[in-house]
Amino acid sequence: MAKVLYITAHPHDEATSYSMATGKAFIESYKEANPNDEVVHIDLYKENIPHIDADVFSGWGKLQSGTGFEELSESEKAKVGRLGELSDQFASADKYVFVTPLWNFSFPPVMKAYLDSVAVAGKSFKYTEQGPVGLLTDKKAIHIQARGGYYSEGPAAEMEMGHRYIGIMMNFFGVPSFDGIFVEGHNAEPDKAQQIKEDAIARAKEAGKTF
């Protein structure tokens, strides 16, 4: 039985969000094909995702110097403890499904905060004499992203930094398989928006069967 993290970063639900609608189609198809797998939905707009701030750096520094966890301040314990929970959960999963919109050429900031929380030496990667090495070499990931314009090719392609960033992080973590499903062009061509959405959902359903 595999453990799947369904990680969404959108303030809207599938009724109004193209990425969330496509993500829902994917994960429902996946669950139908893999009824015994565990799927955990992490809604980044509802979960507590601490930003790495002064409390976190202070807490980490104290722990590294030998201070016990219970000796940290209340704010340090809350944030450092939560980051530990998130990184442990991420490292223990087998598959990752990321769902985001493309906002200002990237993704909502809460996704960056989440990726920061799981980029932990000793869990998702390790340091060696040859440099950092990813530890999640038996995992797979997919990113479902809605883009109002066209970013797969043409002059705007180099401006897309959301999917590319997640791909870079997965590569850094050692994840050998990273794919994408894109819903694009619905704002550029609103008369085709419904068909664009339906086509993406169809592709998502097929991909979910074999993920």
Swiss-Prot record:
Disruption phenotype: Deletion mutant is sensitive to 2-MHQ and catechol.
Molecular function terms from GO: electron transfer activity; FMN binding; oxidoreductase activity, acting on NAD(P)H as acceptor; oxidoreductase activity, acting on NAD(P)H, quinone or similar compound as acceptor
Cofactor stoichiometry and binding remark: Binds 1 FMN per subunit.
InterPro entries: Flavodoxin_fold, Flavoprotein-like_sf, FMN-dep_NADH:Q_OxRdtase_AzoR1, NADH:quinone_OxRdtase_FMN_depd
An individual GO BP term: response to toxic substance
Positions contributing to FMN binding: 17-19
Cofactor(s) in the UniProt record: FMN
Enzyme superclass (EC): oxidoreductase
Reaction catalysed by this enzyme: 2 a quinone + NADH + H(+) = 2 a 1,4-benzosemiquinone + NAD(+); N,N-dimethyl-1,4-phenylenediamine + anthranilate + 2 NAD(+) = 2-(4-dimethylaminophenyl)diazenylbenzoate + 2 NADH + 2 H(+)
Induction cue: Repressed by MhqR. Induced by thiol specific stress conditions, such as exposure to 2-methylhydroquinone (2-MHQ), catechol or diamide. Not induced by oxidative stress due to hydrogen peroxide or methylglyoxal.
Classification via Pfam families: Flavodoxin_2
Assigned EC number: 1.6.5.-, 1.7.1.17
Domain of life: Bacteria
Subunit structure: Homodimer.
Function, as annotated: Quinone reductase that provides resistance to thiol-specific stress caused by electrophilic quinones. Contributes to resistance to 2-methylhydroquinone (2-MHQ) and catechol. Exhibits NADH-dependent 2,6-dichloroindophenol (DCIP) oxidoreductase activity. Also exhibits azoreductase activity. Catalyzes the reductive cleavage of the azo bond in aromatic azo compounds to the corresponding amines. Can reduce methyl red.
Record protein name field: FMN-dependent NADH:quinone oxidoreductase 2
